[in-house]
Amino acid sequence: MAEISGNGGDARDGAVVVNLKEEDEQQQQQQAIHKPLKKQDSLLSISVPFLQKLMAEVLGTYFLIFAGCAAVAVNTQHDKAVTLPGIAIVWGLTVMVLVYSLGHISGAHFNPAVTIAFASCGRFPLKQVPAYVISQVIGSTLAAATLRLLFGLDQDVCSGKHDVFVGTLPSGSNLQSFVIEFIITFYLMFVISGVATDNRAIGELAGLAVGSTVLLNVIIAGPVSGASMNPGRSLGPAMVYSCYRGLWIYIVSPIVGAVSGAWVYNMVRYTDKPLREITKSGSFLKTVRNGSSR
């Protein structure tokens, strides 16, 4: 009896083992089938929102450069009808409107210097900087191309012989333009850091504050350097019009000024948090940053 019961037990145990192996194989096959689908879904869930942000940066930069530079072109072609204060108002209002329209989608950078400054402080993912910068340059280039089609196709605008050029050129010395671009971009980024990244600030007023800062900077620096504050704003028209004179000023100075402005604000702001946690706070860009981290 002991042998029979033992054999029966072995047979039953063997059957159980076989069934378990079959179930394991079926589960592995199902996991192998569904695993690529889950991976694909996760990639789509990450890439689609990011592509939306890039599209927002392209469109926002396009509208910003188109509106601001169109004011410059109209003012030039129509006997200074817009005037310098008018041009400044157009730039400021355009920035304000676009911040409120697209800020909740992409953060409303529209400026490689702002993107790089945020990344240097840890408020923006470093790996997303190249895509953002490329999107901003694309938007600026498309806007400049549109304006060239609308306001003339002169071939020698860089020499100053023709009156339509929507880019930026130093009116004085290179040093003068470099310094003033550094100062106004520092000022702009300092304000952005205060109203758009500090939990204690009123984030809803970020667009108004940033737009007003741009308006003031254009009035101050417009006649001297063109008040770029934005490497993309200068690079797009420069490529479209093949005019690269003094372009290095408008690439280097705004980036250095923006990074300096962001870090100086982080140092002077009053907070009970340790220094390592300062860059974790935010208000206006809080949603965007959280979305990027997911």
UniProtKB/Swiss-Prot annotation:
Provide the topology term for how it sits in the membrane.
Multi-pass membrane protein
List the subcellular locations.
Membrane
* GO molecular-function terms, A-Z: arsenite transmembrane transporter activity; channel activity
Q: Provide the tissue specificity.
A: Expressed in developing seeds.
Top-rank taxon, per record: Eukaryota
Query: Where is the short sequence motif NPA 2 located?
Result: 230-232
Q: What is this protein called?
A: Aquaporin NIP1-2
The source organism is Arabidopsis thaliana (Mouse-ear cress)
Its UniProt domain note says: Aquaporins contain two tandem repeats each containing three membrane-spanning domains and a pore-forming loop with the signature motif Asn-Pro-Ala/Gly (NPA).
Q: Which Pfam families match?
A: MIP
Gene name linked to the record:
NIP1-2
Q: Where's the motif NPA 1?
A: 111-113
Question: What family is reported?
Answer: Belongs to the MIP/aquaporin (TC 1.A.8) family. NIP (TC 1.A.8.12) subfamily.
Classification via NCBIfam families = MIP
Xref: InterPro entries: Aquaporin-like, Aquaporin_transptr, MIP, MIP_CS
**Lineage of the species this protein comes from:** Eukaryota, Viridiplantae, Streptophyta, Embryophyta, Tracheophyta
Carrying N-acetylmethionine, the residues are M1
GO terms of biological process kind: arsenite transport; hydrogen peroxide transmembrane transport; response to arsenic-containing substance
Q: Which keywords appear in this protein's UniProt record, sorted alphabetically?
A: Acetylation, Membrane, Phosphoprotein, Repeat, Transmembrane, Transmembrane helix, Transport
Q: Record's Gene Ontology CC terms?
A: plasma membrane
The membrane-spanning stretches of this chain are 54-74, 82-102, 133-153, 177-197, 201-221, 248-268
PTM sites of type Phosphoserine: S283
The free-text function statement in the UniProt record for this protein reads: Water channel probably required to promote glycerol permeability and water transport across cell membranes.
